[in-house]
């Protein structure tokens, strides 16, 4: 069994794979101050609650964009499972980073594009709705071309509420209309329609600059992807577990001798 962990700025997503099948996944709030022992206790509790035997885990892999949490998570995995997690870096993935500063590309972006190139086999734009909304570009032959980083939907909403005294937090959901009749409706429409229209506009700009003759496929991932995709003209498919699948593919490639 493979334990795949994606440590993001807002959430840590964990997935347990049996072969190619994702047996179970969890989402936990990111807390950089958690210790390795706390992570071990949490992992054991999650497995126990799901009726799973954590000792059956024989491999683990970690992609993290939270440096302060990386070591504690990795050590917690060692304590709980007895496996030493592979830490994803640009050096151990089968993609070519055709960017000016490859060391600054987040591990989550790299595994997303790895998954896209391996699972779909065509030029792809991956839209990931997380703390930031990222649009990443990968060719079918594994060339990472770069992309766009924009404020995430929840990040934008929280910042709006924090800076506007008369606005309060609003639950995200499908807006009923563009012209809101209540303040919460107005905020919801602004966040969701704004995100969808922004993504559509950015995708069109990316397509206009695409360096090959192919029209790239547009897929979305992240917790809010199903919501925003309903209102997007450019997003073709939603794959909520794309990052975990990318981690599975990375682990598989490394286990077969890749990266040496």
Can you describe what each PLM-predicted range is?
Residues 43-58, 202-216:
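Phosphate/pyrophosphate-binding loops at sites that engage ATP/ADP/AMP, CoA/4′-phosphopantetheine
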Residues 47-78:
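Phosphate-bearing ligand-interacting subdomains
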Residues 2-4, 30, 157-260:
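ATP-binding/phosphotransfer module of carbohydrate and carboxylate kinases, centering on a glycine-rich
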Residues 75, 83-163, 192-205, 227, ...:
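Phosphate-binding/catalytic loop of phosphoryl-transfer enzymes
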Residues 24, 81-88, 144-149, 235-244:
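Short hydrophobic/aromatic-enriched beta-strand-loop microsegments
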Residues 2-6, 61, 124-128, 219:
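Short glycine-aspartate micro-motif
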Residues 16-17, 73-76, 138-140, 231-233:
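Short amphipathic alpha-helical segments
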Residues 2-48, 142-168, 173-177:
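Short glycine-rich, Thr/Ser-proximal phosphate-binding strand/loop in the N-terminal lobe
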């Amino acid at each position: 069994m493979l334990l795949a962990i994606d440590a993001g700025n807002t959430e840590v997503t964990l997935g347990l794979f049996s072969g190619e099948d994702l047996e179970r996944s969890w989402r936990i709030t990111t807390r950089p101050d958690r210790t390795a022992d706390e992570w071990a206790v949490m992992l054991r509790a999650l497995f126990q609650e799901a009726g799973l035997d954590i000792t059956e885990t024989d491999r683990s892999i970690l992609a993290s964009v939270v440096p302060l949490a990386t070591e504690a998570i990795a050590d917690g995995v060692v304590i709980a499972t007895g496996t030493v997690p592979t830490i994803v870096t640009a050096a151990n993935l089968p993609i070519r980073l055709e960017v000016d500063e490859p060391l600054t590309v987040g591990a989550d972006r790299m595994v997303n594009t790895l998954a896209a190139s391996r699972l779909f086999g065509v030029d792809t734009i991956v839209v990931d709705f997380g703390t930031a909304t990222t649009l990443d570009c990968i060719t079918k032959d594994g060339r990472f071309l770069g992309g766009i980083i924009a404020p995430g939907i929840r990040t934008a909403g929280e910042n709006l509420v924090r800076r506007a005294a008369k606005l309060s937090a609003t639950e995200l959901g499908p807006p009923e209309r563009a012209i809101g009749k209540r303040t919460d409706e107005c905020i919801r429409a602004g966040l969701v329609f704004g995100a969808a229209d922004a993504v559509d506009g950015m995708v069109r700009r990316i397509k206009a600059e695409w360096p090959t003759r192919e029209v790239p496929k547009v897929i979305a991932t992240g917790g809010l992807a199903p919501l925003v995709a309903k209102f997007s003209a450019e997003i073709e498919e939603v794959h909520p577990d794309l990052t975990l699948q990318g981690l599975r593919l990375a682990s598989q490639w490394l286990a077969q001798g890749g990266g040496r």
